[in-house]
Amino acid sequence: MKTLYVLLLAGITLLMGCDSIDSDHRFIEVPAATIQRNVLIEDFTGQRCIYCPQATEAISQLQATYGADKLIAVAIHAGPLALQTTPNFVGLRTEVGDTYYQHWAIPNVPKAIFDRHGGALPKEAWPGQVYEEFNRTTTVGIELKCQYTTTNQRVEIETDLMTLTNDIHGLLQLWLVEDGIVAPQLFPNNKLDKNYIHHHVLRAAINGNWGKALTLSAKQAHKELTTYTLPQGIKPDKAWIVAFFYNESGVLQVTRHKIIQQ
């Protein structure tokens, strides 16, 4: 929360520090204040998709360039090439993932959506789309804090949101994401890796499949408190909360926070 107010005060200080302007030059348009933008990748994938490991590597390379905390990837296992968990098999398919797969009319995998702009894109288009998304401006900021209690596997999530402009209507989405999941993955030539390590896997939508409707105001930051119990089998030291604010124009800001800081 303190960081959000620092950003606001910085903008005010800039305005107060301006020199007086001659009347002939008073109507020069000044760019609106903006906040550092992060980018969300919704990576649609599946354990039976032989080309998906290559797509995962492509995302890793992009994150190496931009930073994993700025280019935030979420692997959504969904569709006919995704597999569900059974008593004897670790599957990563989820109902919420299938909901998104159907809603966005994903034709096949691997495909990815970037900040919910441009539709579902093939791997070859990803670098250009990432570059385009980072060049967009935003006036929305999000800070995320997590407090985990081991005894009951409960996490207290504090989400602080702010905007530098007029009121903005949208939805706050909270996702549970997990790293380091050992589960089978199919490769080209039907090669099966039974101990493939899957990262940033979507496990659950914490506050509903489409999030919670909010209105952000420049007058004050908005604080959202959420209590969530981790599902059975989730490793808290490998888990993240991903939070993003979006509306009909796309994702305006995204951030992530580890449930247990190490």
Residue ranges of predicted features:
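Bacterial Sec-dependent N-terminal signal peptides
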Residues: 3, 11-40, 44, 50
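Conserved active-site beta-strand-loop modules that form the wall/rim of enzyme catalytic pockets
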Residues: 9-10, 172
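Alpha-helix termination/capping residues and helix-transition junctions
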Residues: 12, 65-68, 106
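Membrane engagement elements in two modes
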Residues: 33-39, 54, 61, 91-94, ...
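Loop/turn elements at helix/coil->beta-strand transitions in domains of secreted/extracellular proteins
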Residues: 38-39, 68-72, 108-109
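The canonical Cys-X-X-Cys-His
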Residues: 44-55, 73
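Typically the conserved alpha-helix immediately C-terminal to a functionally engaged Cys/Sec
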Residues: 51-67
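Short, conserved sequence motifs used for protein processing/export or organelle targeting and
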Residues: 75-262
